[in-house]
Amino acid sequence: MHIMRTIRVLPFLVLAMTLRLCAAPMTDEDREHLRVHFEMTGHMLAEEVRGLSPAQLEYKASPDRWSIRECVSHLAVAEPDYWRDLQKAVKAPPDMKDKKSVATDADIMWYGIDRVVHTKTGGGHEKVDTYKNLGEVRAKFEALHATVIAYINTTNDDLRAHSFGDQAPIDCWQWMLEISTHTERHIQQIREIKADPNFPKK
C-alpha cells in the first residue's frame, strides 16, 4: 500500500522538480539593481526624518496635504500590501511569454523621481493616521525593507517570467523595483515639505 502511494506521488514530485530546475533565477545585474535601490531608499528615508521635532513631523503646507509623519505612515500601511501582492503573483504560473510589459525599466525608475503629476491615494492606503508615533512606523517600515532585501539576496524566483497586474501588466521584477521607487517618490514629497518656506525651523 505504501509502495503504491509512493508510485502515484512520484510523477508529481518529478514534475515539481523539473519546473523548479527550468525556472531561471534573476540575473546578477537584476538582483544587484534591486538590492542597491532598496538599500538606497531605506537610507534616504532614515536621513530625511532623522532629528525632526514633533512640530516638523506634523507640519502641513496646507490642510489637504500630508505631513512628514503621514508620508512615512503611508509607506508602512501600503508597502506590506504591495509585498503580499508580489508574493502572490510570483506563485502563479509564469506568463510573461504571452504578454508585453506596458512600462520599461526606465519608466519605473522615473516614477520615483517625477512628481509633476500627483495621483490620489486609495485602496485603504490613504489611512495615514494608522501610526501616530514615528519610531513605531519606522520600525515597521524597516522590518519589511529588511525582509524584502533578504528575499532579493537569496531568491531563485524568475521575476521577469511572471506578470503583475491584469489591465496594464508589468513583470514582477519591475513591480519589486516600483515598491522601492514608491518609497523614493514619498521621500521626494518629504523634501518638498521641508523646503516649504513656512516649515518650522525646529
Regions found by a protein language model. Give the residues of each.
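Bacterial N-terminal signal peptides that target proteins for export
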Residues: 1-11
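Bacterial N-terminal signal peptides
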Residues: 9-20
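Short, helix-capping/interhelical loops that line the mouth of catalytic, cofactor-
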Residues: 21-33, 84-141, 167, 196-202
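Second-shell loop/turn segments in exported
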Residues: 28-35, 56-62, 67-73, 127-138, ...
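DHp/HisKA dimerization-phosphoacceptor four-helix bundle of two-component histidine kinases
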Residues: 36, 40, 73, 77, ...
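Short, contiguous alpha-helical
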Residues: 58-108, 150, 154-202
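Amphipathic alpha-helical packing segments from all-alpha helical-bundle domains
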Residues: 137-151
